[in-house]
Regions:
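Short, low-complexity N-terminal intrinsically disordered segments enriched in polar/charged residues
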Residues: 1-49, 53, 170-174
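Low-complexity, intrinsically disordered short peptide segments enriched in small/polar/basic residues
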Residues: 27-29, 52, 63, 69, ...
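Hydrophobic alpha-helical core bundles mediating ligand binding, dimerization, or RNAP-core interactions
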Residues: 27-34, 40, 51, 75-80, ...
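A solvent-exposed, acidic/Ser-Thr-rich amphipathic alpha-helical stretch
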Residues: 42-109
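A beta-strand edge to alpha-helix "cap/lid" segment located at domain peripheries
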Residues: 1-18, 80-174
Length: 174
């Protein structure tokens, strides 16, 4: 009887492990395929689909945990909207790559990310970090970013092609 119980528990753990790995691959694939130049809303739809209402987000850069989908969405928007505007209007080239990292705990996944930003000036900034996610079924319930690195300095307005944008004082009234 005890052996049957262990077999059932092992099967359950195996399912949890494989299900979280499948969900992780699906989430990461849609993030990589999404195009910030086209829309930031695509990323919000991904967030809404894969993250639990009670999501908790943390980072090794300090600060208190951010709890709740609305609060995390607000932080996400503060990142996505400027990035979208710089890509759509300023000509910023944005590329993102993901690399799965091995793990052995059911319901937990790790991945490494690289965000490459290239201005029209030719200057680049590459950000990399690692992500730990804890899953409950198909929903992320905890996400932690760690091991942040930056190669290259921050890009400035000189690195973007903003000359096509008409300044507000350059508009004439009819």
């Amino acid at each position: 009887m005890f052996e049957d119980s262990n077999a059932a528990t092992d099967h359950f753990r195996s399912d949890l492990y494989s299900n979280s790995q499948i969900a992780e691959r699906a989430l990461n694939a849609v993030i990589v395929r999404a195009d910030i130049c086209r829309s930031f809303e695509e990323f919000l739809a991904i967030f809404d689909r894969f993250y639990a209402e009670n999501i908790e987000a943390t980072s090794d850069t300090g600060g208190e945990p951010v709890r709740g989908k609305d609060r995390v969405r607000s932080i996400l928007l503060n990142f996505l909207i400027p990035l979208h505007v710089m890509a759509e209007i300023g000509g910023l080239s944005v590329g993102i790559r993901e690399h799965a990292m091995p793990g052995d705990a059911a319901g937990e996944t790790h991945s490494a990310w690289t965000l490459e930003l290239a201005g029209t000036s030719g200057n680049t900034c590459t950000l990399s970090w690692r992500t730990f996610r804890k899953w409950n079924g198909a929903d992320v319930i905890h996400e932690h970013h760690y091991d942040h690195k930056q190669i290259g300095g921050p890009l400035t307005s000189d690195d973007l092609s903003l000359s096509a944008v008409i300044p507000a004082d350059g508009l004439r009234r009819a």
